[in-house]
């Protein structure tokens, strides 16, 4: 992770502060409905504050109020491998519920100061950047996801006999 950050220019010298990364987590709480342990990165849990930063967009595998965004970043990203495994070992049919449940638990128990939500358009250009307080993450992210649905790439036809795809991958989204 440190090498990836360095490749993006995120270094201690450039940022003027320590840049830490590890897979070590701590249990931050128990999820509200399913009573599952919720984990966050140990360094993040000890920080004065956490500012989340992520794109808000539809998820390719599940639908719900929270798909790919700040709530998922908390549930899976801040939870590192241990947090991701605790979610992915459960039924994919409830993934959207787990993302919300774990995200809410983290907001209640970790020093989250807020988040920066990014929405891109069909050309991968920034369409909208919005700062959110912890409370607004819960209320505004579903609205931002709906905006994202309207701005992502779409196939402009209902029926298709053959579709040739030039590029495909996890980093490419559309509907």
Task: Give the location of each predicted region.
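An acidic, phosphate/nucleotide-engaging active-site surface
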Residues: 2-65
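Short, intrinsically disordered, charge-balanced linker/junction segments flanking boundaries
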Residues: 174-175
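Conserved, well-structured core segments that form the ligand-binding/active-site neighborhood
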Residues: 40-171
């Amino acid at each position: 992770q440190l090498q990836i950050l360095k490749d993006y220019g995120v270094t201690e010298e450039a940022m003027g502060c320590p840049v830490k990364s590890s897979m070590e987590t701590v249990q931050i709480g128990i999820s509200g409905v399913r009573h599952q342990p919720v984990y966050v990165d140990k360094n993040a849990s000890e920080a004065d504050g956490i500012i989340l930063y992520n794109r808000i967009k539809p998820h390719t595998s599940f639908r719900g109020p929270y798909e790919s965004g700040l709530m998922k970043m908390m549930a899976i990203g801040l939870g590192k491998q241990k947090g991701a495994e605790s979610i992915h070992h459960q039924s994919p049919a409830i993934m959207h519920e787990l993302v919300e449940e774990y995200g809410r638990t983290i907001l209640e128990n970790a020093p989250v100061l807020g988040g920066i939500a990014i929405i891109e358009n069909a050309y991968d250009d920034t369409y909208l950047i919005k700062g959110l307080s912890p409370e607004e993450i819960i209320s505004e992210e579903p609205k931002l996801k709906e905006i994202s649905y309207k701005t992502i790439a779409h196939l402009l036809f209902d029926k298709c006999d053959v579709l040739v795809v030039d590029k495909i991958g996890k980093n490419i989204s559309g509907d």
